[in-house]
């Protein structure tokens, strides 16, 4: 019995129904520290499980004196009792052990912590020269089931990764550009990879994925480098987590308890969110009598309270979504969890748009702008793009130089500052790109019509125009408001064809319509000139010390009728993509310098901090052990190490993908900031681009930060008054843009993970070559090269006679002995080391959206090269 349309009639959030005395069952998976709290006698007066938060005044004083530390909380998605905040000294992250120490804070919250006494710090084994790379991504869903078959033995003494880090930085302007929703998110799912295990487990003991039994640690006599600072949360500065979760409803286990008569238990899909008591009166009417009818129904629940004396939070059902594992219910759940506003724009917002359509540019506005409508200007975008932010132009001058223009949609013209439209765009802060659709920052009339630089239509733009040498050296630079009329809408495929066939005339029927004022040859030559200059710009950027870490990205083909994935492929980043990227980067850097020179205290810029030093040094040590010396003294040095180490053969390219993935992990996120809030200009720098100043100017249709930058540039050029905004106010908007951008990236990752899981179910099993990324003593991690996903393979999931783990020098090695197919045959032996190439099979599990990676037996026929996709 399905209930996809069941709506819940609820009171408004924030009105709990008198449950201050409720103490629920013990939380699952608690740390030893948690258990001490819960094992206290509950007879008589109830004792608090969580500490009372400190007062604002005491917190403020403690932060000033340095006795307290603030940071963003990150919870390990696979071991939810482990949490971390960054250490202010850039060293190993500060460890927060257990739900009790976390004190009701949720993932992403800005928290204040107090360090525990040193004898309570986490011991990190000093003899472990074979560094376990801190490699668990900040995935926003629990690890998928990995298909292992648990035996009756328990896991012993295994200590998990010390650090969970944020997703990889990516500041190229090709990043999720223009609604290219299929293939612009790194990886399908961020899973754990590890190198040699630190534990001393018996190799016959299976790895139990969700268990962790820490052993008491005597930290006396250990050096400071052997200890990881540990802390407890004493205050939540900002509840950045939405307090919403998707999951399923269950009856409480104890039918005789008073709680059973009042509450159901909401079990979130994300194990980092606590279980939640939901009043039965908020549940579907027949839930108590027929709970199994709802066993596979997804609900959204919002936490409204979490008291000091209760293991579980109190919540309120918000909506019934539909069946778990189906794309639309799961998508709505993802959007809700991450606070994405996907509601229709209000009538008040829509009234801010031009009401008389078709809209034309007012004559007085034409007179205020440089008229470029006769120039050969065109867009290059994914074929499916509708929100065309940018256009390009290039013409050779008589002296052999080039005039190159980057023309960006003038969104700020249509979004008056302080209007209802401005406020909702500022709140949304970014468009969110899912595999199957876009949740726009602005109403579609703006995104797809008025602002979008559609061909053969007059459009308002903000332009940067340079006079460049053939080598890309800037001789002159001009900024200003313009009017353009794009002559054609090229796709990346069209531009790539022009680049690959420089002397051939491309038939008109293979190209989109071109305005009669311009010819195919004119557009073709402009693309070739842009490509030639872009190659020089790119070469010089890397000579000057830039770094690029491209990870495998997955793109999908969808069935037009059902919306289900028909196939997928690795997104190919080609010369046409690089062409656009180089000129977007050039424009962003130029605008950054212009607005900072004019408004040194009020410029909205984008900085990229250097990588986390502890993780990076551990990774370098690991590479040394593997015979791969790496220079990480600068971004450019790292880029050279990655590029010079590898050849063009299949094995070398796969190894480069693995190392690129590993070196992405210590990288921090790039951040928007207000220039007036940082005194040291060295902190303005962008590590990966290796430039002193950078901003975002080129995508105002989908990023609100770009709208702010457009307004600053307009003021810098005298088009409008100087900005009347305090630096701290601008910083708050920058922080909000950072938060929403991070949430958007998470949603993109989860959307891709959702579609890939559905594809495995519908089209699987899927076979691929994979490269081993990490070896533990009973499992190993692989990068599945055909699909760009990372999976852990457990030895006890395989048809093995035995397996053993050893170190050869410092390198970890698993020896697998396969059961023979024929009793008369000898067992097959297979050695697994880091960078081994293996064949794997991805197959769906019974649980919705879960799939396993299974190692193929050596000697079996390899997977066909025939694609199951497209």
Swiss-Prot record:
The modification N6-acetyllysine is found at residue 250. The keyword Lipid metabolism does not apply. Residues 12-32 have a biased composition (Low complexity). InterPro entries: Dis3_CSD2 (IPR041505), DIS3L2 (IPR028591), Dis3l2-like_C (IPR041093), NA-bd_OB-fold (IPR012340), RNase_II/R (IPR001900), RNase_II/R_CS (IPR022966), RNR_Ribonuclease (IPR050180), Rrp44_CSD1 (IPR033771). It is found in: Cytoplasm; Cytoplasm, P-body. Its EC number is 3.1.13.-. Residues 197-212 have a biased composition (Basic and acidic residues). GO terms for cellular component: cytoplasm; cytosol; P-body. It is an enzyme of class 3 (hydrolase). The record marks 389 as: Important for catalytic activity. The modification Phosphoserine is found at residues 31, 172, 864. GO terms for molecular function: 3'-5'-RNA exonuclease activity; magnesium ion binding; poly(U) RNA binding; RNA nuclease activity. Mg(2+) binds at residues 381, 390. Its main location: cytoplasm. Keywords: Acetylation, Cell cycle, Cell division, Cytoplasm, Exonuclease, Hydrolase, Magnesium, Metal-binding, Mitosis, Nuclease, Phosphoprotein, RNA-binding, Tumor suppressor. Disulfide bonds: none annotated. One of its GO terms (biological process) is stem cell population maintenance. Residues 1-45, 169-223 are annotated as: Disordered. SUPFAM superfamilies: Nucleic acid-binding proteins. Transmembrane segments: none annotated. Its cofactor is Mg(2+); Mn(2+). 3'-5'-exoribonuclease that specifically recognizes RNAs polyuridylated at their 3' end and mediates their degradation. Component of an exosome-independent RNA degradation pathway that mediates degradation of both mRNAs and miRNAs that have been polyuridylated by a terminal uridylyltransferase, such as ZCCHC11/TUT4. Mediates degradation of cytoplasmic mRNAs that have been deadenylated and subsequently uridylated at their 3'. Mediates degradation of uridylated pre-let-7 miRNAs, contributing to the maintenance of embryonic stem (ES) cells. Specifically recognizes and binds polyuridylated RNAs via 3 RNA-binding regions (named U-zone 1, U-zone 2 and U-zone 3) that form an open funnel on one face of the catalytic domain, allowing RNA to navigate a path to the active site. Belongs to the RNR ribonuclease family. DIS3L2 subfamily. Interacts with XRN1. This is DIS3-like exonuclease 2. It comes from Mus musculus. The lineage of its organism: Eukaryota, Metazoa, Chordata, Craniata, Vertebrata. The gene is Dis3l2.
């Amino acid at each position: 019995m399905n209930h996809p349309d069941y709506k819940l009639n609820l009171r408004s959030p924030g009105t709990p129904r008198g449950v201050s005395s409720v103490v629920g069952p013990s939380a699952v998976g608690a740390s030893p520290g948690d258990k001490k709290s819960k094992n206290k006698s509950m007879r008589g007066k109830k004792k608090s499980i969580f500490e009372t938060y400190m007062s604002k005044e005491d917190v403020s004083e403690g932060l000033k004196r340095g006795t307290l530390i603030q940071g963003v909380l990150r919870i390990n998605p696979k071991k939810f009792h482990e949490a971390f905040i960054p250490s202010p000294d850039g060293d190993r992250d500060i460890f927060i052990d257990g739900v009790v120490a976390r004190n009701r804070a949720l993932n992403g919250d800005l928290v204040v912590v107090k360090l525990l006494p040193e004898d309570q710090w986490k011991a990190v084994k000093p003899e472990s020269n074979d560094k376990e790379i801190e490699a668990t991504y900040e995935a926003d869903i629990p690890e998928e089931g990995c298909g292992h078959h648990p035996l009756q033995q328990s896991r012993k003494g295994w200590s998990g990764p010390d650090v969970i880090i944020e997703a990889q930085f990516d500041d190229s302007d090709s990043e999720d550009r223009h609604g290219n929703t299929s293939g612009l998110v790194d990886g399908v799912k961020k899973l754990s990879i590890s190198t040699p295990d630190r534990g001393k487990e018996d190799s016959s003991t299976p790895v139990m994925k969700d268990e962790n039994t820490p052993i008491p640690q005597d930290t006396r006599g250990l050096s400071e480098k052997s200890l990881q600072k540990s802390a407890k949360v004493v205050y939540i500065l900002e509840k950045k987590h939405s307090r919403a979760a998707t999951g399923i409803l269950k009856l409480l286990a104890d039918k005789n308890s008073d709680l059973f008569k009042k509450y159901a238990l909401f079990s979130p899909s994300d194990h980092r969110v606590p279980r939640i008591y939901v009043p039965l009166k908020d549940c579907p009417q027949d839930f108590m009598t027929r709970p199994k009818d709802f066993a596979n129904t997804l609900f959204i629940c919002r936490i409204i309270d979490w008291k000091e004396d209760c293991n579980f939070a109190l919540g309120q059902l918000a909506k019934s979504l539909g069946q778990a594992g189906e794309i639309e219910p799961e998508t709505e759940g993802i959007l809700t969890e991450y606070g994405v506003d996907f509601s229709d724009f209000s009538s008040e917002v829509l009234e801010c748009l031009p009401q008389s359509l078709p809209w034309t540019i007012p004559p007085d506005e034409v007179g205020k702008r440089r008229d470029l409508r006769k120039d050969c200007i065109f867009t290059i975008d994914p074929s499916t793009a509708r929100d065309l932010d940018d256009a390009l132009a290039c013409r050779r001058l008589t002296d052999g130089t080039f005039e190159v223009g980057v023309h960006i949609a003038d969104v700020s013209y249509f979004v008056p500052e302080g209007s209802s439209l401005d406020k909702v765009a500022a709140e949304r802060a970014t468009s969110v790109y899912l595999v199957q659709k876009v949740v726009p920052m602005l109403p579609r009339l703006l995104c797809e019509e008025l602002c979008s630089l559609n061909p053969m239509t007059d459009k308002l733009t903000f332009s940067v125009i340079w006079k460049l040498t053939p080598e890309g050296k800037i001789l002159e630079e001009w900024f200003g408001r313009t009017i353009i009329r794009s002559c054609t809408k090229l796709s990346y495929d069209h531009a790539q064809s022009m680049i690959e066939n420089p002397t051939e005339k491309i038939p008109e029927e293979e190209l989109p319509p071109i305005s009669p004022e311009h010819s195919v040859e004119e557009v073709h030559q402009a693309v070739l000139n842009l490509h030639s200059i872009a190659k020089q710009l790119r070469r010089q950027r890397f000579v000057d010390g830039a770094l690029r870490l491209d990870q495998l990205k997955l793109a999908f083909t969808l069935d037009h009728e059902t919306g289900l994935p028909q196939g997928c492929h690795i997104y190919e980043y080609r010369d046409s993509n690089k062409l656009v990227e180089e000129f977007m980067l050039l424009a962003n850097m130029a605008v950054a310098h212009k607005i900072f020179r004019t408004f040194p205290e009020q410029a909205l810029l984008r900085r990229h901090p250097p990588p986390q030093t502890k993780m990076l040094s551990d990774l370098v040590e690991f590479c040394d052990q593997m015979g791969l010396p790496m220079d990480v003294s600068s971004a450019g040095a790292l880029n050279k190490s990655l590029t010079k180490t590898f050849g063009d053969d299949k094995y070398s390219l796969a190894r480069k993908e693995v190392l690129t993935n590993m070196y992405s992990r210590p990288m921090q996120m790039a951040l928007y900031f207000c220039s007036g809030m940082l005194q040291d200009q060295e902190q303005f720098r962008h590590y990966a681009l290796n430039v002193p100043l950078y901003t975002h100017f080129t995508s105002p249709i989908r990023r609100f930060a770009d709208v702010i930058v457009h307004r600053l540039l307009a003021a810098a050029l005298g088009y409008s008054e100087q900005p009347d905004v305090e630096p701290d106010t601008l910083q708050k908007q920058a922080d909000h843009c950072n938060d929403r951008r991070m949430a958007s990236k998470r949603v993109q990752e989860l959307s891709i993970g959702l579609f890939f899981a559905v594809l495995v179910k519908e089209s699987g099993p899927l076979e691929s070559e994979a490269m081993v990324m990490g070896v533990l003593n009973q499992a190993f991690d692989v990068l599945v090269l055909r699909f760009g996903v990372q999976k852990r393979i457990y030895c006890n999931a395989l048809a093995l006679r035995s397996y053993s783990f050893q170190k050869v020098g410092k390198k970890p090695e698993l020896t697998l002995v396969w059961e023979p197919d024929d009793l008369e045959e000898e067992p097959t032996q297979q050695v697994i080391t880091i960078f081994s190439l293996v064949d794997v099979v991805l197959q769906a599990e019974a649980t919705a959206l879960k799939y396993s990676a299974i190692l193929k037996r050596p000697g079996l026929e390899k997977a066909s090269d025939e694609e199951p996709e497209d």
